[in-house]
Amino acid sequence: MSTQTEAEMSIAGIIRKHAKDISAPPEVFDKISIQIIICDGGEKIMVVKVPRSILHGVQMNYSNIIKAAKQQFHDYYIMFVRNFEAEGGGKTMTKRKAKEVEEVWLANACFPFLLTGTRTDVRGVDDMVVNVLLERRTSLSRAEMDAIGAALHGLLGKNYIVDVNHHTKN
């Protein structure tokens, strides 16, 4: 297993400090990894990949963790997603597994707001866009939604547009 970077160790420390209710062995925190994605406009996105066993604890303590992380990494838009690489053990990605990864990462990237649906718009033979629709009460700015779309593109390789779903009662 590769060693963690200084930033990964720092994020792991923040999670340990603010999510005391996580009952996981200390080595689980060593599986936290970070992927940096830089948008066309120069915005930097830090995608923190956390093991499944602690993701729920991160989400339960999200406001405290994100506040502490932004104090240390103020130049980044930070999001937490499930670390499938830590679970995979080098297995090849099947089509079913790829679909599961996409569905989970879509929901994780939009947290703390609810993903109400997706819609794929086909514009041409090799040109399609996946519209990620969030609950109407979302308070994300247009820039934050664009950052989530760019992060998903960096993670999954498809074009994503994140927007509010105005057609639901949420």
Swiss-Prot record:
Subunit relationships: Component of the small ribosomal subunit.
Protein's recorded name: Small ribosomal subunit protein eS7
GO CC terms of this entry: cytoplasm; ribonucleoprotein complex; ribosome
UniProt keywords, alphabetically: Cytoplasm, Ribonucleoprotein, Ribosomal protein
Compartment(s) where it occurs, according to its Swiss-Prot or TrEMBL record: Cytoplasm
Organism of this sequence: Encephalitozoon cuniculi (strain GB-M1)
Chief localisation class: cytoplasm
Superkingdom to which the source organism belongs: Eukaryota
Recorded family membership: Belongs to the eukaryotic ribosomal protein eS7 family.
